[in-house]
């Protein structure tokens, strides 16, 4: 014979310390849960990336040039130094209602046409099937105020015809390319690119609402510090539409800049257009008066001296008119205390003084000459003013036409080839990480709040005797059937381990229990042993049946009574029928002396549970059950009673009054210390002493590997 002993041990950590090894071990034990939850998250992310609406991005580049300085007062020589425009102000201007509102009007963005698809997944499915390009182009859509809250649906009949209806009862039939007018509703469909039967929802948004949407999707940033170059980015679902929108925004921004720069010239032209007819009218009146005076005085000629005075006066009036224009320009730049403004005023005063002197010389002339000089001066001054206005008008027209503004579109809008979002790789990776984190946290929390007994030492430290520690049988586990009921796993043995694999370590542990029971029951009042459990599905029936089998192998007559009249299945495990079982005996339908049924194991008999009664607890309290126990105790060397869990029903507390020894089964890493203590407390309240606890299904846990040590034994025959 050969014997092998393997010991795995590690130091015990303090209870107040964070045991990293235990945490890692707990995660390793629940690795399939972690992998499963992580896989579910990853699959959800993959499905999302397939069905999520792709968002595209278009960008354009705009340069804000320095002011070219096209002022009409450049000849003054004291203009301010040119500076680049403030980028922040220009960014706000691009995002203003002035610019975006014109884009909404130009592209009819206040009219939205969306295809009706299955919620959530419909649009994604259409993209996968290649039907995402079905559209209906609507350029005009208006409805009365009383229909503002109604939903309008456009149903495609073919590539030319359609019907328009609303949830308010409106219905009409239209044709592409023709204006539909009915009951105050006007609709212009330019083109239909959709299969017959397709439905679209036509919505009319407010201009302000669409401007807000444009502002949310538009991003304007400055490239560099005070570089004067702005980058415009617009995001959306339609590749072509976002490009057109961004081009329209850039173009409208440029146009408003030009309009702003030429606004001064435009206002001056409007003023001149108003003044020129009046000046021309006054000139005509002056010419008529001069001609009439000459005809009346027979064409009086002026002497050379008077003519020189007249020329000087006309010249001074022309200079005064020119100064008037210059003063209008310079007053926009400076105050009257500025040197340039003061120089102009001094020049005007000098001309006024000179004009006053000339008027004095005219006064000294004869009356006829005075009148002819005055009339001639009015005509010539009027002619000069009129010509100055005409010249100024031409200059302003040239200025207006030559205004290019400060904005230049460097790069027109173009849609980037890739998808901006969703980022499939990042989403899937993030889902995997999230699933991994949540599953690990869930496993650790479950382990923290539901920590089962992981060592016999835990029970012994609290004064609870451990009669046996039965290891988990991999052989039995492979043959067990498992059902999950309300989240709880129900294990059911299909073959007795003591018969199928008698050398299993679990059977060796049960044989050790058999030896311990021999001494434990020496002082008992009878030879009846009750086996109960803390909770369901902990292997109580497994321990009880195999214990009965190994005891019967010592040439002792053993009777196993299945008192679990609700869920007992020992008759299936031992291969007997369930006829005339315990429930029939207790209600008087069966004979006690013939109730025991032999099993395939010698000296091992069984009383099955019988048919499920409506009142198992009441039957166990009957005198009939006491008679059965007394008869069994007299006719067998050992009587084992398999009872339901004490925390589930009270059957064990009733049966315990008839037995001499009671043992309780707890499952390793499943039942908690609190559950064991509560179970013992219930037996104590009913006056039933419990000899000890059997810790069942012990296995080497990754989380407990380093705590109390783990032993593996092999003891087999030598190979020959």
UniProtKB/Swiss-Prot annotation:
Regulation: Dephosphorylated and activated by wzb.
Residues with Phosphotyrosine modification: 569, 708, 710-711, 713, 715
A Pfam family recorded for this sequence: AAA_31
Periplasmic compartment segments: 53-424
Cytoplasmic side of membrane: 1-31, 446-720
Catalytic reaction(s) noted: L-tyrosyl-[protein] + ATP = O-phospho-L-tyrosyl-[protein] + ADP + H(+)
Effect after changing residue 668 to F: No loss of autophosphorylation
Subcellular location as annotated: Cell inner membrane
Mutagenesis / variant outcome for changing residue 569 to F: Loss of autophosphorylation
Pathway annotation from the record: Glycan metabolism; exopolysaccharide biosynthesis
Enzyme Commission number, as recorded: 2.7.10.-
Transmembrane parts of this sequence: 32-52, 425-445
Post-translational modification: Autophosphorylated. Seems to be phosphorylated through a cooperative two-step mechanism. First, Tyr-569 is phosphorylated in an intramolecular reaction that generates a significant increase of protein kinase activity. Then Tyr-708, Tyr-710, Tyr-711, Tyr-713 and Tyr-715 are phosphorylated in an intermolecular Tyr-569-dependent reaction.
An annotated GO BP: colanic acid biosynthetic process
Broad class of enzyme this protein falls into: transferase
A molecular-function term among this protein's GO annotations: identical protein binding
Membrane protein topology class: Multi-pass membrane protein
Keyword annotations from UniProtKB, A to Z: ATP-binding, Cell inner membrane, Cell membrane, Exopolysaccharide synthesis, Kinase, Membrane, Nucleotide-binding, Phosphoprotein, Transferase, Transmembrane, Transmembrane helix, Tyrosine-protein kinase
InterPro entries xrefs: AAA_dom, Bact_polysacc_biosynth/exp, GNVR, LPS_length_determ_N_term, P-loop_NTPase, Wzc-like_C
GO cellular component terms, A-Z: plasma membrane
Protein family per UniProt: Belongs to the etk/wzc family.
Note: Additional site-directed mutagenesis experiments indicated that the tyrosine residues at positions 708, 710, 711, 713 and 715 are phosphorylation sites, whereas tyrosine at position 705 is not.
Function: Required for the extracellular polysaccharide colanic acid synthesis. The autophosphorylated form is inactive. Probably involved in the export of colanic acid from the cell to medium. Phosphorylates udg.
Protein name, as recorded: Tyrosine-protein kinase wzc
Native species: Escherichia coli (strain K12)
Organism phylogeny: Bacteria, Pseudomonadati, Pseudomonadota, Gammaproteobacteria, Enterobacterales
Gene responsible for this protein: wzc
């Amino acid at each position: 014979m050969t014997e092998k002993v393997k010991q795995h041990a590690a130091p015990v950590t303090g209870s107040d310390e964070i045991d990293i090894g235990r945490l890692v071990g707990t995660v390793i034990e629940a690795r399939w849960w972690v992998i499963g939850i992580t896989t579910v998250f990853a699959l959800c992310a993959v499905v999302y990336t397939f069905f999520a609406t792709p968002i595209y991005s278009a960008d354009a580049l705009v340069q804000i040039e320095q002011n070219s300085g096209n002022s009409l007062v450049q000849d003054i020589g004291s203009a301010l130094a040119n500076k680049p425009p403030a980028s922040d102000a220009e960014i706000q201007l691009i995002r203003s209602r002035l610019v975006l509102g014109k884009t909404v009007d130009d592209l009819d963005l206040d009219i939205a046409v969306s295809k009706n698809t299955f919620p959530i997944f419909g649009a994604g499915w259409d993209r996968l099937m290649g039907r995402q390009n079905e559209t209906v182009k609507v350029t005009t859509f208006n409805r009365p105020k009383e229909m503002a809250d109604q939903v309008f649906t456009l149903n495609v009949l073919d590539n030319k015809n359609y019907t328009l209806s609303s949830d308010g009862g409106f219905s009409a039939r239209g044709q592409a390319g023709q204006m539909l007018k009915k009951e105050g509703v006007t609709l212009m469909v330019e083109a239909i690119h959709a299969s017959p039967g397709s439905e679209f929802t036509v919505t009319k948004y407010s201009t302000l609402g669409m401007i807000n949407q444009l502002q949310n999707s538009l991003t304007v940033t400055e490239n560099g510090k005070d570089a004067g170059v702005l980058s415009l980015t617009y995001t959306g679902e339609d590749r072509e539409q976002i490009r057109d929108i961004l081009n329209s925004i850039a173009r409208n921004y440029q146009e408003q800049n030009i309009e702003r720069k030429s606004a001064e010239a435009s206002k001056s032209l409007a003023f001149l257009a108003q003044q020129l007819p009046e000046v021309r009218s006054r000139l005509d009146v002056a010419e008529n008066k001069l001609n009439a005076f000459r005809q009346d005085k027979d064409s009086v000629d002026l002497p050379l001296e008077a003519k020189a005075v007249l020329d000087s006066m006309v010249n001074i009036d022309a200079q005064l008119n020119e100064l008037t224009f210059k003063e209008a320009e310079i007053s926009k730049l400076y105050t009257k205390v500025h040197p340039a403004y003061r120089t102009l005023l001094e020049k005007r005063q000098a001309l006024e003084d000179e004009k006053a002197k000339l008027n004095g010389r005219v006064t000294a002339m004869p009356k006829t000459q005075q009148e002819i000089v005055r009339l001639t001066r009015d005509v010539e001054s009027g002619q000069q003013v009129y010509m100055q206005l005409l010249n100024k008008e031409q200059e302003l027209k040239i200025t207006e036409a030559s205004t290019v503004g400060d904005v230049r579109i460097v790069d027109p809008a173009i849609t980037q080839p890739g998808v901006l979002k969703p980022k499939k790789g990042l989403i899937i990776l993030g889902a995997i990480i999230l699933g991994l984190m949540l599953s690990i946290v869930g496993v650790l929390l479950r382990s923290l709040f539901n920590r089962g007994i992981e060592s016999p030492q835990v029970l012994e430290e609290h004064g609870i005797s451990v009669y046996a520690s039965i290891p988990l049988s991999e052989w039995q586990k492979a043959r067990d059937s498992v059902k999950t009921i309300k989240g709880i796993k129900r294990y059911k043995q299909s073959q007795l381990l003591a018969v199928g694999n008698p050398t299993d370590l679990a059977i060796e542990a049960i044989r050790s229990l058999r030896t311990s029971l021999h001494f434990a029951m020496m002082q008992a009042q009878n030879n009846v042993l009750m086996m109960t459990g803390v909770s369901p599905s902990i292997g109580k029936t497994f321990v009880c049946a195999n214990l009965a089998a190994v005891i019967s192998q010592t040439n002792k007559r053993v009777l196993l009574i299945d008192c679990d009249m609700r869920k007992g299945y020992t008759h299936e495990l031992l291969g007997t029928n369930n006829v005339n079982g315990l429930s029939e005996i207790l209600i008087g339908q069966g004979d006690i002396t013939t109730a025991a049924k032999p099993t395939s194991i010698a000296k091992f008999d069984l009383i099955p549970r019988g048919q499920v009664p409506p009142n198992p607890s009441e039957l166990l309290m009957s005198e009939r059950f006491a008679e059965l126990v007394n008869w069994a105790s007299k006719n067998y060397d050992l009587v084992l009673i398999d009872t339901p869990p004490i925390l589930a029903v009270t059957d064990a507390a009733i049966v315990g009054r008839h037995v001499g020894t009671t043992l309780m089964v707890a499952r390793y890493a499943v039942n908690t210390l609190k559950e064991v203590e509560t179970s013992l407390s219930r037996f104590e309240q009913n006056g039933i002493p419990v000899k000890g606890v059997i810790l069942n299904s012990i296995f080497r846990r990754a989380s407990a590997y380093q705590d109390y040590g783990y032993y593996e034994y092999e003891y087999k025959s030598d190979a020959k």
